[in-house]
């Protein structure tokens, strides 16, 4: 008798997606970060749901309500620490997931990749509006600086900023709508996750070689499901250790003070996972140019499938492209460092050089390296063919 999981309409979807899913036998632990992202998203939604029960999205009470959660609510301190540090863990997994996709050529699955980039943008938006909710000093001034960038839009910029603010400055209306956005966007992200998986299962997973592996696929369960469970345990251990022993290591000290519009922090900066984009924004002296560079730094990821020039999908057998890839990773690390530094020499010039390098590497050097490798491959094939003919004759 056929198992119910293969015949029942709902169970069949689960079976085809997580149990009998044909999976390349040679995928590594780097393919684990997709499932870890799903776990992180669920943790964020659950902890956020319980925090929302006690949070007050009112300017006069929001900071006090966060203090109340930490001090008076049972295990509120643990919920808050888990939610705040869970965002950092989520973005670490996100960057590793995207880096693996770029390294092994998964970005050539265009629908899957572009939906992933949209999800990345939504998560950035969710994290930004969430950073405003505690209504600390950095929350207020970060919201003021970042939302004020919309004023760079020609003609309608001023009206657009006031529409987002709900008034003439970041105020009670801004906080209320940011809370509504922060609560809603994760559920939209869950919907996009379903689409992401749908398109992924249409093409099948990529593998480290970048070659087709139809003859060599095995069921996802139990071979990879248990490996995912191990990843879950390691992630939960890391998140719990962070929440218990160093909950404030990734947060800004200024945010422990209640928001005061009369006192400007010495150095306004977003959370660490946005610093590379913030550095690109600051590196352009013109406001409109900075906003355009910031938008392009994300949109450039959507262009990658269209400028792939190599005949090979993965970087596994492409040493020159590997060099460019790791230069790109180092460049993002430098931008992250610069984004956390004050706007003064020598950080200004380093930020500008790193910002130009970011776009040069991703939009020029990556396609050029692929084209050059194709030429070298053709030369090598021609030489081998000549040697073969000479040996035969």
From Swiss-Prot:
Heme b b562 binds at residues 83, 182. The lineage of its organism: Eukaryota, Metazoa, Chordata, Craniata, Vertebrata. InterPro entries: Cyt_b/b6_C, Cyt_b/b6_C_sf, Cyt_b/b6_N, Cytb/b6-like_sf, Cytochrome_b, Cytochrome_b_C_euk/bac, Cytochrome_b_N_euk/bac, Di-haem_cyt_TM. Its cofactor is heme b. The keyword Iron applies. The chain crosses the membrane at residues 33-53, 77-98, 113-133, 178-198, 226-246, 288-308, 320-340, 347-367. It is a multi-pass membrane protein. A ubiquinone binds at residue 201. It is found in: Mitochondrion inner membrane. Belongs to the cytochrome b family. Heme b b566 binds at residues 97, 196. It comes from the Eukaryota. This is Cytochrome b. One of its GO terms (biological process) is mitochondrial electron transport, ubiquinol to cytochrome c. GO terms for cellular component: mitochondrial inner membrane; respiratory chain complex III. CDD domains: cytochrome_b_C, Cytochrome_b_N. PANTHER family: CYTOCHROME B (PTHR19271:SF16). Binds 2 heme b groups non-covalently. The cytochrome bc1 complex contains 3 respiratory subunits (MT-CYB, CYC1 and UQCRFS1), 2 core proteins (UQCRC1 and UQCRC2) and probably 6 low-molecular weight proteins. Component of the ubiquinol-cytochrome c reductase complex (complex III or cytochrome b-c1 complex) that is part of the mitochondrial respiratory chain. The b-c1 complex mediates electron transfer from ubiquinol to cytochrome c. Contributes to the generation of a proton gradient across the mitochondrial membrane that is then used for ATP synthesis. One of its GO terms (molecular function) is ubiquinol-cytochrome-c reductase activity. It comes from Synbranchus marmoratus (Marbled swamp eel). Heme 1 (or BL or b562) is low-potential and absorbs at about 562 nm, and heme 2 (or BH or b566) is high-potential and absorbs at about 566 nm. Keywords: Electron transport, Heme, Iron, Membrane, Metal-binding, Mitochondrion, Mitochondrion inner membrane, Respiratory chain, Transmembrane, Transmembrane helix, Transport, Ubiquinone.
């Amino acid at each position: 008798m056929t198992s119910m999981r293969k015949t029942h309409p709902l169970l069949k979807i689960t079976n085809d997606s997580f149990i009998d899913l044909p999976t390349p036998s040679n995928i590594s632990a780097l393919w684990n970060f997709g499932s870890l992202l799903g776990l992180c998203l669920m943790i964020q939604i659950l902890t956020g749901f319980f925090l929302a029960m006690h949070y007050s999205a009112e300017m006069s009470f929001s900071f006090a309500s966060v203090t109340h959660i930490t001090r008076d609510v049972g295990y509120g301190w643990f919920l808050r620490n888990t939610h705040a540090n869970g965002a950092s863990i989520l973005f670490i997994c996100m960057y590793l997931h995207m880096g693996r996709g770029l390294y092994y050529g998964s970005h050539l699955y265009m629908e899957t990749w572009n939906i992933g980039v949209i999800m990345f943008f939504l998560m950035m938006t969710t994290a930004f509006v969430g950073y405003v909710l505690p209504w600390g000093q950095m929350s207020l001034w970060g919201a003021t600086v970042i939302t004020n960038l919309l004023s760079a839009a020609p003609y309608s910029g001023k009206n657009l900023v006031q529409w987002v603010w709900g008034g003439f400055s970041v105020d009670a209306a801004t906080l209320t709508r940011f809370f509504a956005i922060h609560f809603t966007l994760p559920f939209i992200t869950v919907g996009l996750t379903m689409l992401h998986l749908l398109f992924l299962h249409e093409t099948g997973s990529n593998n480290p070689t970048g070659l087709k592996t139809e003859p060599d696929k095995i069921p996802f369960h139990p071979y990879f499901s248990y490996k995912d469970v191990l990843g879950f345990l390691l992630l939960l251990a890391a998140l719990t250790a962070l929440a218990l022993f160093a909950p404030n290591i990734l947060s800004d000290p200024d945010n422990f003070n209640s928001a005061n519009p009369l006192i400007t922090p010495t150095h306004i900066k977003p959370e660490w996972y946005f610093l590379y984009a913030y550095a690109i924004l600051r590196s352009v002296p013109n406001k409109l140019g900075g906003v355009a560079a910031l938008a392009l730094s994300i949109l450039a990821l959507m262009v990658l499938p269209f400028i792939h020039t190599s005949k090979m999908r993965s970087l596994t057998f492409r040493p020159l492209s590997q060099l460019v890839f790791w230069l790109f990773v180092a460049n993002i690390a430098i931008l992250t460092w610069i984004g956390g530094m004050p706007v003064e020499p020598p950080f200004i010039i380093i930020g500008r050089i790193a910002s130009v390098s970011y776009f040069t590497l991703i939009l020029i050097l990556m396609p050029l390296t692929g084209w050059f490798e194709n030429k070298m491959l053709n030369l090598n094939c021609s030489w081998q063919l000549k040697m073969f003919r000479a040996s035969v004759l």
